[in-house]
Regions:
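N-terminal small/polar-rich segments of proteins
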Residues: 1-63, 97-138
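Terminal beta-strand-rich extracellular "head" domains
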Residues: 59-98
Length: 138
């Protein structure tokens, strides 16, 4: 029996589209300062799965704003630089590993796209995006 140590996860920033205008489509890519970022630490070289629970809409009051995540809206790297990120589809479970030498670390990013209608009511729209990280056992 091999008992792995614990996984620690720290959300370093939220996905932020900034100010957007009506009648537009706005994308925040993984390598943008607006992308969400998590730092994960655990057993060096351990396999992990990344599972996102993503919203379909952002909301303020009863008003909604569509949000989507394409097949390159997720990114992960042993380095804390999205330029080196391996892109993945956050709509599917993603399997990877923590850095195999030194501290077992992984940085994860999330981008996304909002579609703003011509009649979109103003407001600060929000919704939770949840990341679950689990050891794979390998």
């Amino acid at each position: 029996v091999v008992i792995d140590g614990t996984i620690a996860m720290n959300r370093e920033r939220d996905l932020d589209f900034g100010d957007v205008v009506r009648n537009s489509v706005v994308t925040v890519p993984v390598n943008s300062n607006g992308s969400a970022r998590w730092r994960i630490t655990g057993t060096s070289g351990a396999g992990v799965t990344l599972t996102f629970f993503l919203p379909s809409f952002l909301q303020v009051g009863s008003n909604t704003l569509p949000i989507s995540f394409n097949n390159t809206a997720g990114g992960e790297s042993w380095q804390n630089n999205p330029r080196f990120a391996n892109l993945f589809d956050p709509n599917a479970v993603h399997t990877t590993q923590l850095r195999p030498s030194g501290l077992g670390v992984l940085t994860v990013w999330l981008g996304g796209t909002v579609t703003v209608s011509a009649l979109q009511p103003p407001g600060v729209y929000t919704a939770p995006a949840t990341l679950v990280v689990s050891y794979t056992g390998s």
